[in-house]
Amino acid sequence: MINGVLLLHKERGMTSHDCVFKVRKILHTKKVGHTGTLDPEVSGVLPICIGRATKIVEYLTDKSKTYDAEITIGFSTTTEDQTGEIVEEKKVQNPISEEEIDAALKQFQGTIEQIPPMFSAVKIGGKKLYEYAREGIEIERPSREISIHRIERTTPALFENGTVSFRFTVLCSKGTYVRTLAVDIGKKLGFPAHMSHLIRTGSGDFTLDECITLDELRDISEEGTVDEHLVPIERALNHLPKWEINDTLASKVENGAVLPMPDEFAHFAEEDRVAVFAPSGRCMAIYMKHPTKQNLMKPAKILSQDKQS
């Protein structure tokens, strides 16, 4: 069985679920899951878990994301990106200095509050926001805390036809809406704005350079070399602390045993996780602090081997 993380270069126009469906079809396996929705109009890095790796999906969705975005200042849209209808227009009469733009971007770095857009999959009252939006209903959305680790302009500001546009790169926490960020940058500069282009260039330490397209996946599937192009579970979890155990403990982990907590993890909070490695170098499980028993750790996820392995 195929196990590992496929780094897919998602094309524009496809949903994340479309990608999962196509990967299942190409690889003839049902055990496929993506690690977080990427809007249809956005291309770029979409890690897809296959086989045993589907058990670690939740640990990959939390990784920070890197985007290359373009903002157009001068009008805003219903969807906050280039696909929506214009809702507000205010022509830019004079060029905006790059110093002013850079100063505005700098104000967004750090932990900030963001209100999710109406055209998004965020659920309120058991219903997705885009479902309300399609009915022409706008509802109040609570703001959410996000982190902008880095944001900087990457191209000169282009002034033409009453608009100013430029590209920027942003490294941000999960759940950040870059189109909303573009709108807020415009507001900071005194104009309506929208995101006119977006590509995800990184997810955690996975980069666009490592990704393959669906067409390339078809080719390597026919060649029988899919395994060579997958990220092993062990590397996919390298953002977690590592606990290397001996053979005695390994047999206990295989059975989901509760284990004494090593001193190095004594500081763990309830939400912290550690990747447990067998002497062979295989990641066997993900452990967590026991919620009720002091100085003990329990399995959060057991990554069983396939029967044929």
Curated annotation (Swiss-Prot):
Coiled coil: none annotated. The keyword Isomerase applies. HAMAP family: TruB_bact (MF_01080). Responsible for synthesis of pseudouridine from uracil-55 in the psi GC loop of transfer RNAs. This is tRNA pseudouridine synthase B. One of its GO terms (biological process) is mRNA pseudouridine synthesis. GO terms for molecular function: RNA binding; tRNA pseudouridine(55) synthase activity. It catalyses: uridine(55) in tRNA = pseudouridine(55) in tRNA. Belongs to the pseudouridine synthase TruB family. Type 1 subfamily. The keyword Oxidoreductase does not apply. It comes from the Bacteria. Its EC number is 5.4.99.25. The gene is truB. InterPro entries: PsdUridine_synth_cat_dom_sf, PsdUridine_synth_N, tRNA_psdUridine_synth_TruB, TruB_C. It is an enzyme of class 5 (isomerase).
